[in-house]
């Protein structure tokens, strides 16, 4: 009964806040490697980077600092850790990850999830592998993969990896018979010194973020205005520049807000690793619409912000934005949620709901 009450309250509050169209948001930490910082503590969650999920699975999170991927369920605003922890091969410097819808057809050895790493390794996991992912592409000093996404075109599965060192989008074939894609994934107007930092397939369009390379072409250089976002089709043909400089600061996280997400419904959210802000753009014409702000109206900032993802409805609310981060210079980790600040009516709902939960708890004693 108590669990049902919590779930009902969370759903009603979420629905009320999503429809309110609020411009202000607040952050709730769900998981941290540091005790007392979030709902639960998980020492494996260090420099939490990429996030992925199937339509029904828990959240899979890349833990760059510990070389594993950890799994979390979020139901009714309450998070729990799944028993499975997957070790990533190579040096374990895992960054982005993807869910592979083509696994049932044998794409990528039937691996359900794929992972990119900074040592150039691409790895994959399926249930029969147990707690260790397999190597699909061996590591190489020529490659520094910061992100990866999935796409299907011409009846074949492909992976698209952001190679920060080489300055390319590297295409991974899901099967040996897949044809080579015709496009080059080149933005012809991109300034020298910038390289693909992340890539995300959103409704069949590939969005590529670019950050400024350091002298070793391994890490990004943060700074106001240092970033670009361009779009390509699944064959690698350049579609156009979506965003340039302005509020961008080493952009990495990408997510499309659902149609029910208030003022920014249907807009592209771009998370900046550099300053931790989240910018909003019209996904069709690139118009800058503003940035998420906190309860005081100041720009919302999450230290070491990496991934952005909405829930799938089975795990995590579809109207709720989840994030991963590597705060304190990537030495710690966070997995959390960003939600609209409730309007007065929603606060009354929450207050009444808290009273209901208190009554339920008393009756349960």
Show the residue positions of the predicted features.
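Bacterial N-terminal signal peptides
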Residues: 7-15, 355
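Bacterial N-terminal signal peptides that target proteins for export
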Residues: 1-6
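Short, charged juxtamembrane terminal tails flanking transmembrane helices
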Residues: 362-365
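Sequence/structural signature of beta-propeller domains
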Residues: 21-340
């Amino acid at each position: 009964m108590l669990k049902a009450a919590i779930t009902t309250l969370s759903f009603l509050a979420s629905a009320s806040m999503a429809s309110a169209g609020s411009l202000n948001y607040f952050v709730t930490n769900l998981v941290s490697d540091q005790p007392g910082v979030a709902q639960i503590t998980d020492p494996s969650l260090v420099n939490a980077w990429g996030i992925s999920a199937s339509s029904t699975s828990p959240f899979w999170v890349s833990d760059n600092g510990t070389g594993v991927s950890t799994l979390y369920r979020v139901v009714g605003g309450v998070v729990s850790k799944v028993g499975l922890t997957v070790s990533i091969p190579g040096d374990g410097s895992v960054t982005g990850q993807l869910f592979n819808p083509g696994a049932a057809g044998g794409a990528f050895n039937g691996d359900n999830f794929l992972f990119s790493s900074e040592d150039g390794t691409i790895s994959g996991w399926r249930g029969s592998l147990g707690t260790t992912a397999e190597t699909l592409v061996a590591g190489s000093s020529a490659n520094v993969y910061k992100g990866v996404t999935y796409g299907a075109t011409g009846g074949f599965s492909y992976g698209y990896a952001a190679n920060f060192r080489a300055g390319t989008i590297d295409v991974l074939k899901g099967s040996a018979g897949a044809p080579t894609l015709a496009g080059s994934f080149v933005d012809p107007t991109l300034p020298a010194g910038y390289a693909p930092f992340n890539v995300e397939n959103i409704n069949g369009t590939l969005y590529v973020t670019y950050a400024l390379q350091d002298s070793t072409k391994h890490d990004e250089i943060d700074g106001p205005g240092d970033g670009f976002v361009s779009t390509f089709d699944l064959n690698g043909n350049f579609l156009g520049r979506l965003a340039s400089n302005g509020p961008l600061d080493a952009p990495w996280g990408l997510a499309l807000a659902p149609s029910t997400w208030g003022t920014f419904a249907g807009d592209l959210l771009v998370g900046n690793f550099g300053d931790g802000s989240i910018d909003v753009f019209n996904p069709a014409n690139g118009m800058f619409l503003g940035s998420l702000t906190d309860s005081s109206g100041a720009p919302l900032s999450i230290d070491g912000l990496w991934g952005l993802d909405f829930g799938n409805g089975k795990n995590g609310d579809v109207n709720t934005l989840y994030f991963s981060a590597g705060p304190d210079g990537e030495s710690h980790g966070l997995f959390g949620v960003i939600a609209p600040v409730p309007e007065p009516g929603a606060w009354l709902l929450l207050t009444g709901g808290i009273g209901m939960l208190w009554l339920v708890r008393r009756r349960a004693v």
